[in-house]
């Protein structure tokens, strides 16, 4: 592995640059873009793949990090499919022509005719401004306006280009502000050629099952074993063929290449991401702070007995430390209803949630993402005592008069308390794989978080396998060590 050094200034910005790439005349350029796709098609990561293809051909450009795929607040109703923005961090001698190229490429290749509202921001500098980093953190769990983004863009002298209503600049700014210096994962995404977009994707299911079994837990959410579903392929008309998510770039690459597809692909690229980190649920809230479309978690006490709705959905209510109450919805596809319906008043829980806004026929509701049962309340039933002689149940003699066995004539004043055994236990409960959002943290990742760099000497990008142009996945090259 090559030797790398990390300057103190770069360490603060969580940007690691190899020592041989830190020439005096290289500037660090951060390129962020979002909202280039629509429900009808295209994909922001695909544009990142194509832009990277261009940048890799330029001798004066060096990547200082993997391309970043940053998933933002998944509860935003006007988001495109995955609410993912992209950031490319490069070292270069000349920024102006790169910015012009990316700006023009995004304006030409975004799905504007179908409602895309792309935004592109470019910032030069080693250290990302604090205001941009805070904006990025907020974008993970709250609603931010275009005006919020524009104020920071102006104050920090960030170059910004937008089309349509320009909402993409919100995600673009958030992307360059997310440094992923803490937990993160990787995803190797393969892309279809233009002529194949919209046609059925063909994958060998047995190879996917084998790959998943061999690589778990270094890869995750490849399949939903309970419902027998493949999870690595999207279902829409976008150019993504499949994506393998995991803990390190080598494993996701080897896993992708093992699938041996017959379809000729445009290529593939590895992203460093915040997927699978629960990054949107790390802010603790009280109900007085809750607003529509926010995400977070709250600790509270069950204050209303759960009840099951038609279709298997479950509703219950919890109160927080201020004794404010909120209804909680547990939808059938999550498979959490079987746990939620067994809660009783007085149980202490943590819940991760997204906020559904109030509408004509329902109030504001917390949509459950995870349930942590911290303390189960005891359920005690009072029964008439047993006769110590014949072991039959005694009869009440009347209010305040105690109990008597009708056969043995033995009397007692004491009632008999029975603690009911609960069918659930204290612990952490997560929805089924098929209901996971991009940001949902799988159970096996708790306690296995990554840091960056997580090995001596960062994995550079590009490397022998992290970017590949046109061919079959089985036209693979040997995965060499970095």
Language model feature labels by segment:
Residues 298-303, 345-361:
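Flexible glycine-rich surface loops and low-complexity tracts that mediate binding to linear polymers
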Residues 295, 334-351:
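Short nucleic-acid-contacting surface segments enriched for D/E, G, S/T with interspersed K/R
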Residues 98-108, 112-289:
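Long, hydrophobic alpha/beta structural blocks
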Residues 356-384:
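OB-fold/S1-family single-stranded nucleic acid-binding modules
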Residues 305-333:
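OB-fold (S1/OB) nucleic-acid-binding surfaces
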Residues 344, 417-482:
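Long, charge-rich boundary regions
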